[in-house]
Amino acid sequence: MPNGSDEKISVAPIIAAIEAPYLSDLSERDKPWDKHRKNTDKVSAHYRGSEFNVLADRTSFCSEFLDFRLTPGDEGELRLKLSTARFCRVRHCPVCQWRRSLMWKAKAYKVLPQIVEKYPKHRWLFVTLTVKNCPIAELRATLTWMNESFKRLTKLKDWPAQGWLKSVEVTRGKDGSAHPHFHCLLLVPPSYFSHGYLSQAKWVELWQRCLRVDYQPVMDVQAVKKGAQPMSLVPELLKYCVKESDLVADREWFLELTRQLHKTRAIGTGGVLKQYLKELEEEPEDLIGQEETGEPDEGHLYFGWRKREKKYKLVDY
């Protein structure tokens, strides 16, 4: 799974240093590094001069230097794999958010086949639960209310899932409001589609009842085809809590977001899936990716962040 980069490179390090001084020139797959690090500079600038000045310092030094190992590919070509980097681990750092998502996805891809093997006849639902937009200053209270409502939902007699994975996403409204919503992967028994099926209208009714509101909330319910694997849903489930364009769009909105989401959880698990996926609820210790044991090391390439150029450039070490 994601472990630096698997992009194949058919050039020797010396030639690469002369003809392709930037990471993005060497590895197509590693181009996202430039985008995420550029946005990290913007986030750092947002934090500067606020009560989060310490976060400004931490993000400004995040992933300034990347050490990639050169490893042989199947056909003798060289591949880049991230070996060493220092991350700030600030929750809303775009680089760390990206790396965290990669690690979460890697764990999910590893564990989900075990669940499918354990429950081969069960089916999967992908459910999105929403509420009306709220002022950004009321985001924490809104999420608390949504989590309490979700807990009520799971205790209803009609609740069909035997296990679930829930992630939080917050998007920025055009008027500066916040739109929090849940993405949920539900494991349901085979009988769900024969005599326990819930229509879209019924789902809306149940969610409205648990929210205790006088409007019909917007929902989306999709069933994974019979025999299909749930892995295709992982990217949507475990992508990010707040997309980068929203993080950098407005400084005051972003600072309030930081206050509102402080010490809140982005991922929750329950039912029979908790024992398999509980690790996703915690901050991953490893943001690089475990190395494959016994893999040959053909040398290293080092890249430093160049703020003016907004690119990672090959450097001597």
Regions found by a protein language model. Give the residues of each.
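Right-hand nucleic-acid polymerase module
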Residues: 1-178, 188-317
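Cys/His-rich zinc-coordinating modules
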Residues: 184
